[in-house]
């Protein structure tokens, strides 16, 4: 059962969204709740503590919504890459952008800070 405070926090953050699913987890001994919402045909995942404090928001965005510094850094590091998906992840004061892309025939996940600084790259095992 998802606490009322969690659902209220999600509704306040995304008033026009529809809750799709919710799950409970524990990290470092602390319980949390993940709520997936659908917002204008895109998904977002909101992670809250049991009191309804939002810990992080991970939402799908379009490439055009990326900050110019990030879009420029991607074009420079991965010229002619096919972008398969973009997520904006906000955790406290930090915002990073997680991109699923195909570059030189390889499926990759690349993460950039909001200022365009490259963070890391890993193989994308998703089909």
Language model features with spans:
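Interaction-mediating elements
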Residues: 1-127
């Amino acid at each position: 059962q998802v606490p009322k405070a969690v659902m209220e926090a999600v509704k306040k953050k995304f008033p026009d969204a529809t809750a799709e699913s919710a799950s409970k987890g524990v990290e470092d001994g602390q319980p949390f709740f993940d709520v997936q919402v659908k917002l204008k045909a895109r998904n977002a995942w909101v992670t809250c503590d049991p009191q309804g404090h939002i810990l992080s928001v991970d939402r799908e965005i379009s490439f055009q919504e990326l900050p110019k510094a990030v879009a420029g850094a991607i074009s420079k590091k991965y010229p002619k890459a096919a972008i398969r998906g973009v997520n904006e992840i906000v955790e406290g004061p930090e915002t990073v952008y997680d991109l699923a892309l195909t570059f030189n025939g390889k499926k990759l996940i690349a993460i950039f800070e909001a200022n365009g600084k490259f963070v890391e790259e890993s193989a994308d095992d998703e089909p």
